[in-house]
Amino acid sequence: MAHKKGASSSRNGRDSNPQYLGVKKFGGEAVVAGNIIVRQRGTNFHPGHNVGMGKDHTLFALTDGSVKFGVRRDRKVVDVIA
């Protein structure tokens, strides 16, 4: 059994693509219906008024307005104030 892998062989050389998660529109920013507000894994932020949630937990605006972050029942929620 060789204890070296041989010429030009390496176990490295892979790197997955970045996920581009996070808050895309911050509090007070104007949004148009359909704008993505937060991209996340799981429900770190929950949808509030005029905010929808996609199957990958992405939060998006349902109406035009401005973004407002808050806390309701010990949950972080995102609202769009028309």
Swiss-Prot record:
Gene3D superfamilies documented for this protein: 2.40.50.100
One term under GO cellular component: cytosolic large ribosomal subunit
One term of GO molecular function: structural constituent of ribosome
Highest taxon in the source lineage: Bacteria
Region (Disordered): 1-20
PROSITE patterns: RIBOSOMAL_L27 (PS00831)
Signal peptide residues on this chain, from the entry's feature table: none
Pfam families for the chain: Ribosomal_L27
Record's keyword terms, sorted: Ribonucleoprotein, Ribosomal protein
Annotated family: Belongs to the bacterial ribosomal protein bL27 family.
HAMAP family, per database record: Ribosomal_bL27 (MF_00539)
UniProt-recorded name of the protein: Large ribosomal subunit protein bL27
Organism: Bifidobacterium longum (strain NCC 2705)
